[in-house]
Amino acid sequence: MRVLAAMSGGVDSAVAASRAVAAGHEVVGVHLALSQDPQTVRESSRGCCSLEDSADARRVCDKLGIPFYVWDFSDRFKEDVIDNFIDSYAIGETPNPCLRCNEKIKFAALLERGIALGFDAVVTGHYARLTQPADGGDGYLRRGVDPNKDQSYVLGVLGAHEIEHCMFPVGDTIKPEIREEASAAGFSVAKKPDSYDICFIPDGNTQAFLGKHIGMRPGMIVDQEGTQLREHAGVHEFTIGQRKGLDIKAPAADGRPRYVTDIDAKTGTVTVGTRENLKISTIHADRLKFLHPAMDGQIDCEVQVRAHGGVVSCSATIDRDADFMVLNLNEPLQGVARGQAAVLYLPDADGDIVLGSGTICHTES
């Protein structure tokens, strides 16, 4: 096959490309340039798409003897990821820009151009697996074998079309073995640290970034009884479950810590309460993505709401036509925010199967 290797400049994508070459595919490496501002992400080594990362990706491709290109997706990245991030916080949501980037840029946009240029698939360094069912139908997306690095959650926002054109060569390997393989191949990125920062906020100050783009939208912090505690500069400064930075002078009557339990962007009201007030038992989600035929109607499954969070079993009611689902949790979750992805899994001894996902729009205690 003719495959496009998405080269982030890290060790995982390097080994993924190497394995694709070893498998006999015709491989071309591509690094995505995502920043319109050369003073931010392009010069930072903390993100996943800096100038240093591009140079690392080129060196790997040179080592493998495959062509290497840099594609400028900065306009689409700004529109689909950065602007969406800002808009979501402005309405009281807590988005995950890395999931959004996977959905809109690293797969949808990359595949769109790749297929137009005659490529059959995109190969990435994500820790997830695709397995073919016995009847030879469409492949299933499963968790990677390394529980500490599994990235099936961040891929749960993809559509079936993207999954059909993906290859995840490192999903059946644990991270230490990937580093050993990279070292044996002579890749300079063998010991390169993983990146976790939001690439377009290289200094890590999310509040300052949002404040610059959203501006002052004053509102009030209140307790569970509606008592006003202090004014704030905007709901974008808060997320569900937040404890630090509330700057409330008067302590709670019972002396317990306060957490953000609700955000009403329309009124600018931020409600705080105890950890107990964070517990929710029902999740409503829309903007559904379907990766498995079992994601329909009434099903028992598991749900994960954070990239590195645990799973909770639930009873799901899924209406494909209405683009909506309700998840009744078998045990409560804490700190679940609107805008997060709820990814559904079907437990399986060979690796949990990703059924699909939805974007959380409402929760109930």
Curated annotation (Swiss-Prot):
This is tRNA-specific 2-thiouridylase MnmA. It is found in: Cytoplasm. Catalyzes the 2-thiolation of uridine at the wobble position (U34) of tRNA, leading to the formation of s(2)U34. It catalyses: S-sulfanyl-L-cysteinyl-[protein] + uridine(34) in tRNA + AH2 + ATP = 2-thiouridine(34) in tRNA + L-cysteinyl-[protein] + A + AMP + diphosphate + H(+). It comes from the Bacteria. It is an enzyme of class 2 (transferase). Keywords: ATP-binding, Cytoplasm, Disulfide bond, Nucleotide-binding, RNA-binding, Transferase, tRNA processing, tRNA-binding. PANTHER family: MITOCHONDRIAL TRNA-SPECIFIC 2-THIOURIDYLASE 1 (PTHR11933:SF5), TRNA 5-METHYLAMINOMETHYL-2-THIOURIDYLATE -METHYLTRANSFERASE (PTHR11933). Residues 149-151 are annotated as: Interaction with tRNA. InterPro entries: MnmA-like, MnmA-like_C, MnmA-like_central, MnmA-like_central_sf, Rossmann-like_a/b/a_fold. Its EC number is 2.8.1.13. The gene is mnmA. The lineage of its organism: Bacteria, Bacillati, Actinomycetota, Actinomycetes, Mycobacteriales. Disulfide bonds join C101-C199. One of its GO terms (cellular component) is cytoplasm. One of its GO terms (molecular function) is tRNA binding. Its main location: cytoplasm. ATP binds at A6, M7, S8, G9, G10, V11, D12, S13, L32, G125.
